[in-house]
Design a protein with these regions (language model features):
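Conserved class I S-adenosyl-L-methionine
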Residues: 112-120, 217-236
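A short glycine-rich, Lys/Arg-flanked "PGG" loop and its adjoining helix->strand segment in the class I
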Residues: 199-214
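Acceptor-substrate binding/catalytic loop of class I
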Residues: 235-250
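Class I SAM-dependent methyltransferase SAM/SAH-binding core
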Residues: 127, 131-169
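Conserved alpha-helix/loop element of class I SAM-dependent methyltransferases that forms part
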Residues: 91-110
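A conserved beta-strand element that flanks and buttresses the S-adenosyl-L-methionine
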Residues: 187
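Glycine-rich SAM-binding Motif I of class I
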Residues: 122-126
Length: 382
């Protein structure tokens, strides 16, 4: 109630910082009495919000009703079939493969607890539910897809929670819940290039993953031999205003191993293969890389790297920004991953996938079917 009153005050519907008291008695021409208009508006908003929150949402059950609805006609991130043959218009062409979705099929989700970051309308949470997850938590910075997410729950008969997290930092504290516990699988895809500090986001997520759990990390990358992050100065990489950094492939590989995440599989699409109205191609060779990682108990340094382990032992940032005590106390999970990758793509010293070497062999040029794309259909099971 306090929050609703605050909203009314912010909208200028309540006077003097408080709900307006009705004047003593204002006679009308009919001898009746009325209250002040701002007070009436405030109370109407409060009552409407209370009814909305106490009453389950209803959605069109016929194609005719749905086709005429604001729900169907509104802006959608994903293309979603809500009723047979009625698919919302998403932001991506059907040829654009959704790499983390494809990789998720190799994970045995039965009985698992899953976390999805930046869920939008909830395509990945629905897929996780349909693959047998016991519990799924969807998240986003703001609650901007509440109605559409509720629609997916309704039409797909999916049961998952949602939590608004604000800026994607300090997630271990924001999402820690004794009743829910930690996660067997975490999907953090399409996020790291949207934040000021990709390492801070991963540092906040790492304590939420069970020992031996799986994390899918997907982000835009620069393809070269450097260990760098390239800044989106003047929109040179993308014109989108919340895009800041592209990690180099080698930098991403290193950061994951530094945070005790072993790359075990990956898929890649070059930005040159993406047919979209959004400009992805620049004079920098770049693309979108999705990596499946297995949580380990120690940093994974290459044979010649003496710095990584020293840094992990003595760095204040490493010790202070990642709750390693929580990581070490996590239960051990045994989520199977069914895909195998060619041995020549593995580093001989770490046993992990060499991401730069793997790009050419693990490239997808386009989606072969809608279930590989940013499209969700009622018949999809993954």
């Amino acid at each position: 109630m306090k929050r609703l009153l605050g909203e009314c005050r912010d909208r200028g519907l309540c006077g003097g910082g408080k709900v307006s008291r009705p004047p003593s008695r204002l006679k009308t021409d009919h001898g009746a009495y009325s209250v002040s208009l701002p007070f009436q508006r405030a109370m109407n908003i409060i009552l409407k919000r209370i009814r909305q929150r106490l009453s389950p949402q209803s959605f069109p059950d016929t194609a005719e009703e749905l086709a005429k609805s604001d729900l169907f006609a509104g802006w959608w991130y994903y293309s979603v079939e809500l009723l047979p043959g009625l698919i919302t218009k998403g932001q991506y062409p059907d040829s654009f493969p959704m790499l983390p979705r494809i990789l998720l099929r190799n994970c045995d989700l039965r009985g698992t607890t899953c976390l999805d970051l930046g869920s939008m309308e909830g395509l990945m949470p629905v897929v996780m539910c349909r693959q047998g997850a016991k519990a799924v938590l969807a998240t986003d910075a703001i609650d901007h897809c509440r109605q559409k997410m509720a629609a997916l729950r309704y039409y797909y008969k999916a049961s998952f929670e949602f939590q608004q997290v604000g800026l994607m930092y300090d997630l271990s504290n924001k999402l820690r819940n004794p009743g829910r516990g930690s996660f067997d699988i975490i999907n953090v895809s399409g996020l790291l290039y949207h934040v000021f500090s990709p390492l801070m986001v991963l540092a906040g997520l790492r304590p939420l993953l069970k020992r031996n759990g799986l994390m899918i990390v997907s982000t835009n990358v620069v393809v070269d031999d450097s260990f760098t992050m390239q800044f989106n100065n003047a929109g040179s990489l993308q014109e989108e205003v919340n895009t800041f950094w592209y990690l180099s492939v080698r930098a991403l590989d290193y950061v994951l191993r530094y945070l005790k995440l072993a790359p075990i599989d990956c898929l890649y699409i070059s930005h040159r293969d993406i047919k979209s109205s959004v400009r992805y191609v620049t004079d920098v060779e770049s693309g979108y890389l999705s990596v499946v990682c297995r949580a380990k108990d120690d940093p994974i340094a290459s044979r010649e790297d003496t710095w990584m382990l020293k840094s992990a032992q003595h760095s204040w940032e490493y010790a202070g920004l990642v709750d390693w005590d929580s990581c070490n106390q996590q239960a051990v999970t045994h989520v199977p991953y069914s895909a195998t990758i060619e041995k020549n793509l593995l580093r001989d010293d770490t046993g992990t996938v060499d991401l730069l070497r793997a790009l050419s062999r693990r490239t997808i040029h386009q989606a072969e079917r809608s279930s590989d794309a940013h499209v969700l259909r009622l018949a999809d099971i993954s």
